[in-house]
Amino acid sequence: MAKSPETEHPVKALGWAATDNSGTFSPFNFSRRATGERDVQFRVLYCGVCHSDLHMVKNEWGVTHYPIVPGHEIVGIVTEVGSKVEKVKIGDKVGVGVLVGSCRQCDQCSNDLENYCYKQILTYGAPYLDGTIARGGYSDIMVADEHFIIRWPENFPLDAGAPLLCAGITTYSPLKYFGLDKPGLRVGVNGLGGLGHVAVKFAKAFGTKVTVISTSLSKKEEAMQHLGVDEFVVSTDPQQMQAAVGTLDGIIDTVSAPHPIVPLLSLLKPHGKLIVVGLPDKPLQLPVFPLIQGRRTIAGSGIGGLKETQEMIDFAAKNNIVADVEVIPIDYINTAMDRLLKSDVKYRFVIDVEKSLKPQ
């Protein structure tokens, strides 16, 4: 049997991996490549737990290669840089988000939209250039091309800032691209979870009036008092939904469970935009009449390019925007995944990798 290219990698690493679609994690020894001339190696301090990690470890999208080491909200301290690296130096705080590679030549890459490159390489679970499967941040060491490294602002929290590398850019980018960042606009956020609470924070920082749409009345007090939303609509209450018809310029739909979108479209003004950023594991039904009636738009958005991700992190640092997190040791990850499946987290788990990942 041919050897895996990973066996040639000299950097010994320790992580936690799922080895089958039960999604159960256990310690996992593997190797990373040596630091190339344009690579940055860093010691992982924290890694956020994204809902997509749960989908991937259970192979719900049918693309998972086992064993899988998830994690694409990764922050740490640089320990080694290649000879041609100019972006960061040893000792700097850095982050890596959802991408670690792209072709760097296509129109999308040329326009700083590596996230839409057809040859993009995801931070974990995807084949890398050398034929190995990329391993994510549930591990003690990362090596990445400097182009995909995010510089971390001084005094910006590492633990609460880490989820912004996915949840932050996933919501910041569509707010900017679709023009929903103008003061005075009325923006809806469907779902108040890991993505939704960050979307609220960015939308408020842009000066918009924010309406949270949720199935959970229990989240109203938190949304109004802690997050400062302007309106809260319970989507299962027909009277509340009727009162909100035609009031919103746009909606960021963060829900990752299958859900009807006709009620959301009714909340939009004419020419309003429904932007889907959640990842349900089943198709959503697309109604045509509400689109035609008000020239409304349904669109999608996926993370952001590296330039925009750096812009987002800098904006967040300037405006004191962080995720609300529960910091956990890495040996709690199986329990955390069970809780995530039940939406029992407010609002994002973050693994304290440095303090809790130890050789077994």
Swiss-Prot record:
Its EC number is 1.1.1.183. Zn(2+) 1 binds at C50, H72, C166. CDD domains: CAD1. One of its GO terms (molecular function) is geraniol dehydrogenase activity. Its cofactor is Zn(2+). Zn(2+) 2 binds at C103, C106, C109, C117. It catalyses: (2E)-geraniol + NADP(+) = (2E)-geranial + NADPH + H(+). Transmembrane segments: none annotated. Expressed in leaves, with a very low expression in peltate glands. Keywords: Metal-binding, NADP, Oxidoreductase, Zinc. GO terms for biological process: alkaloid metabolic process. 66% inhibition by 5 mM Zn(2+). It comes from the Eukaryota. It is an enzyme of class 1 (oxidoreductase). Optimum pH is 9.5. Active from pH 8.5 to 10.0. SMART domains: PKS_ER (SM00829). Belongs to the zinc-containing alcohol dehydrogenase family. Involved in the production of citral, a mixture of geranial and neral with a strong lemony scent. Reversibly oxidizes geraniol and nerol in equal efficiency. Also active, although at a lower efficiency, with cinnamyl alcohol. This is Geraniol dehydrogenase 1. The gene is GEDH1.
